[in-house]
Structure formats: structure tokens, C-alpha cells
A protein has these predicted regions:
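N-terminal Rossmann-like FAD-binding beta1-loop-alpha1 element of flavoenzymes
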Residues: 2-28
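Short hydrophobic core segments
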Residues: 5-7, 183-194, 330
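Dinucleotide-binding Rossmann-like beta1-alpha1 core, especially the glycine-rich loop
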Residues: 45-129, 233-234, 272-273
């Protein structure tokens, strides 16, 4: 019988394998597509942030930053003595309309308690800090300028985690698991992401397709933060002389990754041009679509022991946050598996019982 079997070798599976292997557990990771062609992490914008509503998400975001900064030391291997995730620390800027202002002020209290280091700015003052932004319709905004938020290369991060886990003794194999009952192990972790319901049908996690557009503009602002306009749901960041912009539209239970090209002219371009006048001259140069493993109950992760099994744990439903929360979730799963409780960040409120009992804890800061 195996010691630990992880179903899913994406970013959550790789992070869990790393932390468990560090503790001396014998880990086997089963991944059906080692190219990760349709996995969530390589098709994301690579963002990491601590600007959230729920305290657990804020703290997981803080740990992500700490971990990413230590990649050169933590994840170096004999084959790769200089691992990197190509971190860019331009920060995050989130903008809110009047309808979200009260909720945002409550969130700021959680930011203070968790020492998130975010700054609040009135909408009327926004253009003084970011002169290229039209602040019409913005009531308040939060941002960071202390190198605590930004983005990374998702594939490089995953590769570094996986390589280190393998050096520590983890085994990654190609295979497809169709039923939990197939696995004979002391501990089983479902990190199946969008396809969680194929294994645990009582968990409300489904694929949610999002489209990202690549655009070019004569005015390129390299130092622009990853910006989310929560009045429209559109978000964007600079990338290699161009910009990447995400559509607020999404498709639940999608079975393909064909980009929603019509969204660009109908939704994304108008929203971008209204917020940043220079974006009126945008030109679409490409795009792609990727999946969120969306928790339809409340957009929050589902993590912990499944009460219907003696030895099954799970981690999914990150709704676009899997990459940034992977280090904290991998560590948390290792803690609860090896000690029986969370030792660092208490994520007990993300428990499986929450979704089985339909007890929502909404996370409104979803991009």
C-alpha cells in the first residue's frame, strides 16, 4: 500500500507533494496529462496578491509572497541550482464603485488585522497617483507599492516545485483516476481542480472558462500594476511591450477552451478605453482561454478531510487563486495530515463540511 497518493499534478498537487516530501512522507502523484495543456495554472495571469475580503485568503496571499521570494533557496536542486519564477512586483490596484464601497471598507479592517500592507485611496484622488486612469465612477481603491504583490511565470513556478518534490523523493506518474476507490493508500489527496466532481460528486466545483486577450497599445506603461476594475470585472497587466486583459464573462461547465473572441469588442475594449483613455487605440494581437476550478457555493477554496472517507483529503475550488494559494495550501494539508490540525494559517472554515452543509462564506474579490 502506498503512503500518500495525490490525484492531480497541477500547482496544488505539486505544492502538496513538495511539503509532504519535506516531512519524509512517500508521495506518489498521478497526473493524466503531464503536458498540463488544459490545466488551470499555465493559462492564468500568474498573479499573487493579499487583497481579499476573507482573512484566510489574505494570509495565504502573504505566505505566497514569502515563499516566492525564497524560491532560489527553497527549491534549488542539483539539476537546477538557480530556480526562479520570474517575479514582477508591480503590485495590484483594485478599484470599486459606490455599490461595493461598504463591503470594501469592511475588507480594509481585515487587511489591517492581517497586516496586509495595502493602501486605500479615494476615487477622487486616484488620478493623482495613477494619472493615466479615468476615475469616473470609482468610489475607492486599494493598492500596494511595497513589492508585496505582482505576478510570476506559472509554468516556471510549477516546474521548480515539481523538480524539488522529485528530488525529495516524490514520484510523478502518468495515469487517470476514475474513482477514489481505485486508490490503495494510507492517505489520498484529491487535487483534481476543475474535474473534482468526477471523483467527489458532492463537491460543487466545476470548470469555469475565462478568456484572456493580448493587446497592443502605442502607450506602454511597464510599471503599471495588475489592475482590476470591479465596476466592470475587467482586469489587465503589462506583459512584454503589450497588455494582457481578462474578460468578466465566464462559462460554467465548459468543455472547450475556445476563447470568447466577441467579448473583446463587446465588453473588454469598451471597459478598458473608458478607464484608461490611451486604451482607445488598442489592437487585439491574440488571446487564450483557461479554466478556473470554481466553487459555485461561495468562490472560496474547499480544503481538508472529506467526512465520508477515513483517509481522503481534498483541495480545490480556488476560483482563480490556485497559483497564489498553492504554497499555503500545500503546507496546510501537510500540517493537518501529519499533526491532525493546522499549525500556521487556520483554514478550518474552508472545510469540506462547509459546502456539504451549504454554508457559504463568500469571497467577493474575484477577478
Amino acid at each position: 500500500m502506498d503512503d500518500v497518493v495525490i490525484i492531480g499534478g497541477g500547482i496544488i498537487g505539486a505544492a502538496s507533494a513538495y511539503f509532504l516530501s519535506k516531512e519524509g512522507r512517500k508521495v506518489k502523484v498521478i497526473e493524466r496529462d503531464p503536458t498540463y495543456k488544459t490545466a488551470s495554472f499555465p493559462l492564468s495571469l500568474g498573479g499573487f496578491r493579499r487583497q481579499f475580503f476573507q482573512k484566510e485568503n489574505i494570509l495565504l496571499g502573504k505566505f505566497a509572497r514569502e515563499f516566492i521570494y525564497q524560491i532560489p533557496n527553497l527549491l534549488k536542486t542539483e539539476k537546477n541550482p538557480n530556480p526562479t519564477a520570474s517575479m514582477v512586483t508591480n503590485g495590484y490596484l483594485l478599484m470599486f464603485g459606490p455599490e461595493h464601497a461598504d463591503e470594501q471598507y469592511k475588507a480594509l479592517e481585515n487587511h489591517k488585522v492581517c497586516e496586509a500592507g495595502t493602501k486605500n485611496i479615494k476615487g477622487s484622488e486616484l488620478s493623482k497617483v495613477f494619472p493615466y486612469i479615468n476615475s469616473e465612477g470609482i468610489e475607492t481603491a486599494t493598492y500596494t507599492d511595497n513589492q508585496s504583490e505582482g505576478w510570476i511565470d506559472p509554468f516556471m513556478f510549477h516546474s521548480a516545485l515539481k523538480s524539488k518534490a522529485i528530488e525529495l523523493g516524490a514520484e510523478f506518474i502518468k495515469g487517470e483516476v476514475k474513482s477514489i476507490s481505485e486508490i490503495k493508500a494510507k492517505t489520498i489527496i484529491s487535487a483534481a481542480g476543475c474535474w473534482t466532481k468526477d471523483l467527489l460528486e458532492d463537491i460543487p466545483v466545476v470548470p469555469q472558462k475565462h478568456t484572456v486577450f493580448r493587446v497592443k497599445c502605442p502607450k506602454y506603461i511597464k510599471e503599471m500594476p495588475l489592475t482590476g476594475d470591479l465596476t466592470t470585472g475587467v482586469y489587465w497587466r503589462p506583459e512584454g511591450g503589450e497588455y494582457l486583459a481578462g474578460s468578466p464573462n465566464s462559462v460554467f461547465d465548459a468543455t472547450d477552451l475556445e476563447p470568447a473572441w466577441n467579448d473583446f469588442e463587446e465588453l473588454v475594449w469598451p471597459a478598458l478605453a473608458q478607464r484608461i483613455p490611451a486604451f482607445e487605440e488598442l489592437k487585439l494581437t491574440g488571446g487564450w482561454a483557461g479554466y478556473y476550478d470554481c466553487n459555485k457555493l461561495d468562490n472560496n477554496a474547499v480544503v481538508g478531510k472529506h467526512p465520508k472517507f477515513d483517509n481522503v483529503y481534498m483541495a480545490s475550488g480556488f476560483t482563480g487563486r490556485g497559483l497564489m494559494q498553492a504554497p499555503g495550501i500545500g503546507r496546510a494539508l501537510t500540517e493537518i495530515i501529519t499533526t491532525g490540525s493546522y499549525q500556521t494559517i487556520d483554514i478550518s472554515d474552508f472545510a469540506v463540511e462547509r459546502v456539504l452543509g451549504n454554508n457559504a462564506r463568500p469571497e467577493p474579490y474575484v477577478l
